[in-house]
Amino acid sequence: ISKDEESFNKFCKTNEITKDDLQRLGFISSNGNMLFKNRIMFPILSFRNNIIAFGGRAIDDFGPKYLNSSDSVLYKKNRNLYFTNEFITATKKKGYAFIVEGYFDVLSLNKLGYANSASPSGTALTYQQLESVSKYTSKILICFDNDEAGLKATERVLEIKNQISKQVEIHCLNL
């Protein structure tokens, strides 16, 4: 949980991380405000299991409920997904991947033994994200929430699934 700005500043100073570095990496806004203050933090990994960005869930009623790192030299929201470090291995072993809406969905499925789950950090699943997952499996199960946003997102997935370069089997389950 990112609550203590003083400790964070001390860490940055000790590790020679400048405000410019933090801004380029999407941790502070252009006016110098910490973007992830008072949030539960979720590290967003690359497919090589390096942390490239963060998502944050507000722990109070101030600001947006969820906030993701801005696009940076390391992170492009339309290309990256949220998953745990076991995602690729589990996806290859099970032969399929779950795509769910959010961070807590991924963590809940992991706890149940489904480390083959990932999230676009919302409902805006893109062609590029589907293409990335298709490198590890040809079977993708879309499990968005059974609300208006989830249903619309499912329709968008059905529209873009034929653009994937590989033969991919996509099933949509609105839960």
Named regions from a protein language model:
Residues 1-3, 174:
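Conserved alpha/beta enzyme-core scaffolds, especially Rossmann-like or related mixed alpha/beta domains
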Residues 125-126, 134-175:
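Conserved phosphate-handling catalytic cores of large alpha/beta enzymes
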Residues 5-136, 153-154:
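Phosphate-handling DNA/RNA-contact segment within nucleic-acid enzymes
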